[in-house]
Amino acid sequence: MDNDGPRSMTIGDDFQENFCERLERIHNTLHSINDCNSLNESTTSISETLLVQFYDDLENVASVIPDLVNKKRLGKDDILLFMDWLLLKKYMLYQFISDVHNIEEGFAHLLDLLEDEFSKDDQDSDKYNRFSPMFDVIEESTQIKTQLEPWLTNLKELLDTSLEFNEISKDHMDTLHKIINSNISYCLEIQEERFASPIRHTPSFTLEQLVKLLGTHTETTEPKVPKFSPAEDILSRKFLNLKKNIPPIEKSLTDILPQRIVQFGHRNITNITTLQTILQKKYELIMKDYRFMNSEFRELKVELIDKRWNILFINLNHELLYILDEIERLQSKLLTTKYTKDITIRLERQLERKSKTVSKTFNIIYRALEFSLLDAGVASKTNELAQRWLNIKPTADKILIKSSASNKIATSKKKIPKPKSLGFGRPNSVIGTITQDFQERVAINEGDSNKTPENSTTVALKGKKLGKALLQKMNIKPATSPNSSNAINPFFDPESPNKGKLILSSVPPLPYDETDETTLRVSRGENEKSPDSFITSRHENKVQITETPLMAKNKSVLDIEKDKWNHYRSLPSRIPIYKDKVVKVTVENTPIAKVFQTPPTKITTPNSQVWVPSTRRRTRLRPPTPLSQLLSPREGRLDKTPTY
């Protein structure tokens, strides 16, 4: 270390290397003393030479520390370098302070070992000569330690000061300065994007978009960026991100950092005012950049929010002015000149549509005024247009009310015929009538074409000839349907007699043609007739039915089913009867039938009282006891009691 005066101190590389080596040897020697368990020469490294080296290092450091922490020798020019050096060697210096406080503990352990050696009974003449100098080194080192402790307190204060200075200057201020500079760059980037096309131009929008955008505003929120395109949406997101970064910077820079600088100035070291002044100057530089960032952010906010909202509503005021002029012209046209009904209706519709647009636009502007989105100039212009609209509106309302009343009267007098559809649900008779009319029209056209020009009293138009040629070219034929399709179909008949009735049966009451008795007999299928005669008679009956109009009556499905049941009920049964003669003879010859009583079968339900009879083996049923045996005389029954 070279001293160049009372106010300057230079820490050279040689001094740093020598000083750090001594601190390291002091630490290693204390560690060896604490780990030593015996002073035997063969097992320990503790010797007089080691203790003498420890004493020399401790004495040298004790001579340097006072000059290092002397309040008078801390120069203003070198104070930052000294703070950096303390910060660089902080771990070694804190370790040295801890070692000095532990010297007494290490020496006490060494004295215990020496006492153990002298308490032994062995006759070692060199023991006193070997251990006696150690007592002198311990005593002298203890004295140096006592002299060094006050300077170590000052050294610890300097180390704490350097740590706090580094935290405020580098960790807090430098980091905050970097964040501010990055936000300034981000703000300038957003300004460049805002000036790009088409964002710098007047935004194009609809009233629905404007209403939706105003719906996102509330009385507590700040105005938002008017965005009507994807590019404006991206720009709005970037602006919001920049806006979120500013409050933490402002809180840290205006509230936290000044208090830390003031608290740092309360430390009791030499030239602390110099260090505080350095921090204050650095703080002023950061505040300068912070003010520039705020000014750029406010300009960006004015460009993106305030000016764009003003331009937007200035354009709305221009549109309102043009629309009000058009409404006045429409009113003068409708009041001074009479036009045809079609033109009058068109003009009234234009007046109604423009009146609604004006009212809706004023409602939007007044809602924007509630959120303070307009400046005083735009608001005053809007108020002038609103007063003009109040003067025009009564006349427009009077015209529209009169038009609405006349339209209602015309609508009530006009009869709207019911459209006739040719599609699904139309009776076949109507379709047949239309087809017949079409056929007659085609026949008339063909008759006209066969006439000569002399016989024809009228000259055929060119369009009719062209239509006739197209019909012949396309080969269009009229749609015809059989007469059977004219029968009533209850599923598609709009005038069905079953309409309005509650039908509970699964089969709807469908009408069918009744048949006579001959057809009924044929349908029953008598066994005497052959298949050929059956087909012939059926054909004849069908001819008779079609020729007789009185047989075309309707009969429901239920009546037909009833007749079918009555018919089959009158016929004899065709189920074969099986006659078991062997069983019958056995029953007649057996004087008494043996009845086997078997236990009842299992009841299906707990409450059932029905027992099912069964045989013992459940393979076949026994024949019943003849009635003659059951009604035989008492004596006969006693003799012929069946065995169970």
UniProtKB/Swiss-Prot annotation:
Phosphoserine modified-residue sites: S496
InterPro entries per record: Karyogamy_KAR9
Keywords linked to the UniProt accession: Cytoplasm, Cytoskeleton, Karyogamy, Microtubule, Nucleus, Phosphoprotein
Pfam families: KAR9
Compartment(s) where it occurs, according to its Swiss-Prot or TrEMBL record: Nucleus; Cytoplasm, Cytoskeleton
Residue ranges, annotated region (Disordered): 506-534, 606-644
One GO BP annotation of this record: establishment of spindle localization
Nucleus found in the keyword field: yes
Top-level taxonomic group: Eukaryota
Primary location class: nucleus
Further remarks about this protein from its record: Present with 656 molecules/cell in log phase SD medium.
Role: Involved in karyogamy. Component of a cortical adaptor complex that orients cytoplasmic microtubules. It may be involved in anchoring cytoplasmic microtubules to the cell cortex.
Name of the protein in its database record: Karyogamy protein KAR9
Protein source organism: Saccharomyces cerevisiae (strain ATCC 204508 / S288c)
Species lineage: Eukaryota, Fungi, Dikarya, Ascomycota, Saccharomycotina
